[in-house]
């Protein structure tokens, strides 16, 4: 983890964890991974160090969490604030994060498909339907939007429009697919 050599423009915050018999470090780590997606991780015997966007460094130990980030970066400031909120939430509540095994088992593509289908349901209401097992791929869920004589077919596994007989509907469906892809992408 390479951080800038000049630390004069960096902010450092240390939060002591209230260890009332419960180790929250693993929960915090899982919360951060679930929220920010790709992060650089280095583990030592006493602590786990995380680096996000090459700027925000988080060191998690059994008794405290240290966060260091560049003051002038709004994105880094937002990430640091989010981590502080996670710590406060974890200290104040029971376990509300997926376990590590559940996190590994969770299929991100299934979640993305469900979120996209929900987005299409919100946009098109009863005009949207899910068609299961179309063609050779029986486990692939496709969807269709039918408005009058216009029909669009969407392949949710590839997040692409398969067929559409109306240019205005095609534009709207492609726009919603684009928005859906952005909404289901991790923050960093």
Swiss-Prot record:
This protein's GO CC annotations: mRNA cleavage and polyadenylation specificity factor complex; nucleus
Listed GO biological process terms: mRNA processing; negative regulation of mRNA 3'-end processing; termination of RNA polymerase II transcription, poly(A)-coupled
The keyword Membrane belongs to this UniProt entry's keyword annotation: no
Keywords: mRNA processing, Nucleus
GO molecular function list: RNA binding
Function: Component of the cleavage and polyadenylation factor (CPF) complex, which plays a key role in polyadenylation-dependent pre-mRNA 3'-end formation and cooperates with cleavage factors including the CFIA complex and NAB4/CFIB. Component of the APT complex, which may be involved in polyadenylation-independent transcript 3'-end formation, including snoRNAs and snRNAs.
UniProt miscellaneous comment: Present with 1430 molecules/cell in log phase SD medium.
Protein name per UniProt: Protein SYC1
